[in-house]
Swiss-Prot record:
Keywords per UniProt: Acetylation, NADP, Oxidoreductase, Peroxisome, Phosphoprotein
Catalytic function, reaction form: a secondary alcohol + NADP(+) = a ketone + NADPH + H(+); 3alpha-hydroxy-5beta-pregnan-20-one + NADP(+) = 5beta-pregnan-3,20-dione + NADPH + H(+); 5beta-dihydrotestosterone + NADPH + H(+) = 5beta-androstane-3alpha,17beta-diol + NADP(+); all-trans-retinol + NADP(+) = all-trans-retinal + NADPH + H(+)
Record-given protein name: Dehydrogenase/reductase SDR family member 4
Organism of origin: Rattus norvegicus
EC number of the protein: 1.1.1.184, 1.1.1.300
Site annotation Responsible for the stereoselective reduction of 3-ketosteroids into 3alpha-hydroxysteroids and benzil into S-benzoin: residues: F177, L180
Gene: Dhrs4
Amino acid sequence: MQKAGLLLRGWTRAWKSVRMASSGLTRQNPLANKVALVTASTDGIGLAIARRLAEDGAHVVISSRKQQNVDRAVATLQGEGLSVTGVVCHVGKAEDREKLVNMALKLHQGIDILVSNAAVNPFFGNLMDVTEEVWNKVLSINVTASAMMIKAVVPAMEKRGGGSVVIVSSVAGFVLFPSLGPYNVSKTALLGLTKNFAAELAPKNIRVNCLAPGLIKTHFSSVLWKEKAREEMIKETMQIRRLGKPEDCVGIVSFLCSEDASYINGETVVVGGGTPSRL
């Protein structure tokens, strides 16, 4: 009886290995043969995410507003042996969003993953001093463009039988960053966008989840840490011991895009080093 049980367990493990291999999936390559679009992915968190998705087996299309940045990032990642291409894309422009989607379809005949990472923050100061122009710019890029980007990829994902979207918000959506009012508001809006799209797209087998990074040391966040005194004040306020690195954010994104997260939808995961992060 014991011998039969051992044989059965061995057969089960072998069958699981065959099943994973037949689908092109392995624990080393959980995103094998998937096609991923990552916006704002030539630097910082976006670049780190693009690298990790490619390392995990995906074909990644990166994008940014400037051609030289796209060229540099593509050369770097291809030099690491990763399957990466790139295109200029200003997510606030409909024609650029269409160009990004069309490149993925032309090169890889489908789209499985979208990481919506693009954001702007043109203002630092008191909320009462924010102009209408600034409000429109922040909400247009940080919120509306994310919604339009998701809308653009859904038809392609449907043809593949489903897909996964990760919206990059921020811990600022829960706990305000000082003097970044419009940015904070836009990131809170993305939490709601995640919930609404998750519910609406679930019947299409498209999952929508959200990453909320804490204070990550990138060029984008440098206004909060480039002065040592300000960095220490921010760390104390956020109750963290150190600033995060872009690489701290990548594992959870790859997981959310994988089959291991097939029963996770509409959730926001905070990667914030312990920053209090609930509304």
